[in-house]
Amino acid sequence: TELIKDFAKYPELMFLDRFDTVIPILYGATMFFIGYFANMFFPELGTSGAQTLVWGYVLSTVFLYHVTFCINSVSHVDSVGNRRYETTDHSRNVWWLSALTFGESWHNNHHYFPASSRLGFFWWELDLGYYVIRTMKLFGLAWDLKGVPERYLHPQPSA
């Protein structure tokens, strides 16, 4: 936060920065105890604390990291996906990653107009993250969403 002074305006970001190791530990402990209590109250399920810790915390975190890292690797490989917009980088739109990344794989769109909260610019570009943000807006948890101006939707085709 010393490097990014704007973060000080957001208490939730300051909290996460201050307790960055506590949150994952609490999450892992919660996963363990869900399995532990499930075994205690519903033994017929055959669930244990170790199982829910591994599946709900360890493997899901590894999967999340790999999918996240795919965005900045796979979405910049010239032989993968397509480039709708001419940008100064090698960003690509990778449709088959869109469901796993909640729309983050519309990476060329993002590099072309990064101010938009919407990464799937067209109806056929699955962008689950945008739907989550729109739902948050309904509950007052998000505001000032930036759309995609019409002039950005129909640019000159890239080479």
Language-model features, listed with the residues they occupy:
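Short leucine-rich amphipathic alpha-helical surface patches
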Residues: 78, 103-104, 110-111, 117, ...
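Transmembrane alpha-helical segments that form the membrane-embedded catalytic/substrate-channel core
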Residues: 53-82, 103-109
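Active-site-proximal inter-transmembrane loops
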Residues: 4-12, 80-106, 112-113
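Generic alpha-helical structural context detector
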Residues: 72, 98-101, 107, 133-137
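Non-catalytic, topology-defining segments of multipass membrane proteins
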Residues: 1-69, 116-159
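Generic serine detector
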Residues: 48, 60, 73-75, 79, ...
